[in-house]
């Protein structure tokens, strides 16, 4: 191998290593998705620590607010990358009201990249009783805690 080729390979490896996500720096939401909390307690620390954008990217008619993970936040849930963080708590100024009837007094969760079957298996393995629903087949799945 020539000196130039070796140098190019070394630089490419160094750059690639620097751009690869580091699993040790990911912030896992597993413990909070045990469904023993409320939306305010779930969302507030994520906003304070700037893991999610403060303005919801979407507010559903049932008042569920979808927050986008902040750039570089590396949020995970049960080992899956988080696409969106969900939440709504009645009477809490942190959440915007939708146009329809609110889903419940307090609900929270996450949308992750993974199939519903794989996500459900990991959620149950962790002992959570969260509701797991397919959003986009084989791509996105919602993990949802709904307190009545």
PLM features per residue range, with description:
Residues 69-126:
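Long, charged/polar, surface-exposed segments that mediate recognition or autoinhibition
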